[in-house]
Amino acid sequence: MKRVILLAAAAIALAAPALADDCTITVGVVMGLTGPAGEYGQAGAKSVEMAFRDLNEAGGPHGCKLVADTRDSQSQGSLAVDAANQLVQLKNVPVIIGGIISSVSIPILTSVTGPGKIVQVSPASSSPTLTNLGRAGKTNGMFFRTITSDALQGTAAAKYALDQGFKRIAVIHVNNDFGVNMLAEFSKAYKALGGEIVSVSPYNEKQSSYDAEASKGIAANPDGLYLIATPVDGATIARAWISQGGPAKFLLNDGMNSPDFIASVGAKYLNEAYGTSSGTSPTASTEYFNANYKAFSGGIDPSTPAADRAYDAGAIVGLAIAAAPTQDPVAIRDAIFRVTSKDGEPIHAGKADFAKALDLLRAGKPIRYEGVIGPVSFDRYGDITGPFRLWKIVDGKVTTVGEMSTDDVNALKAKIVK
């Protein structure tokens, strides 16, 4: 076991030998701890650390200790690629978990993990481009993600928007792969269901002002604004929209499910703010995570986007390392399917169940990891399915008001195609 393991999720660098005499398995984490997606990356990195702590307390894979080597991508694809290359080329890592946002995960995949046949697991990148790369044979079957694709979420958002009275909508979206694809999927469904998009304004991250984008959207006389953004830029855009007299009615993407966004904009302006997120099917893991994460993370709310899914990404990787006969990337990839087997023994988060899992894996038996987000099962492209959470901001808090199942969304998509 002379390999280091990288989890892509950029943050702090913890240099450690690949496998020291004390049997330490170093796992690299590349997540954006700073930049527009810094809130997600900080939550995700802590979640991976928590999963590793639980696995270590259970005995560790092959009796070894998992340690995270975390690097900060600053939410930038080029920096993430540099970090991933260093970890793969200099430390010979077989796995990368990350990034958080699609505009970071995609360049890691196309530049490093795909060509190099290195396992990559993202906890939060939802762009349909990642599925398309798999279909085109560009991932070599090495990519996985613990979040549903925007190909489904865009349809769920369109139906929810119309149900909440958004008949004419303006759109302001981040000008990257995530924003462009989310808008494309939403637009197809929204128009087919009878909605009208009256204005579209892409924006670049970290602009000094978003007044022009807000002004353009308001001039089109919409019922409200569909804001596809990250919390920092999204709050600035929302404030510009409100200050210029735009209707205080918002449709928000999953990443805007953020206490920081609400605090920055002001809860009193968000009484008609609605959103969709990749949902969960609650299990014992969900209860465990929600009860323990805040204390472990130093106060981060367990509902922070990417927190739950990053724990599951870390747990699945750690269990796959334990299940694999060697630390070869292909062996770990194959083991991911064994630890999420529909025929396996159900395993939940935490020390006790992880100890049970390690015993079963040593005996050569499959397990079914039922994670914080629910039972996890990957298809041939590394995608998962799951419900979509429908939420509304009520008294300054994100409140679940409904759910759309994957079957509901697929039925709606089929109807739209016809």
Regions found by a protein language model. Give the residues of each.
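Sec/Tat signal peptide C-region and signal peptidase I cleavage site
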Residues: 14-20
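Hydrophobic alpha-helical targeting segments used for export or membrane insertion
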Residues: 8-14
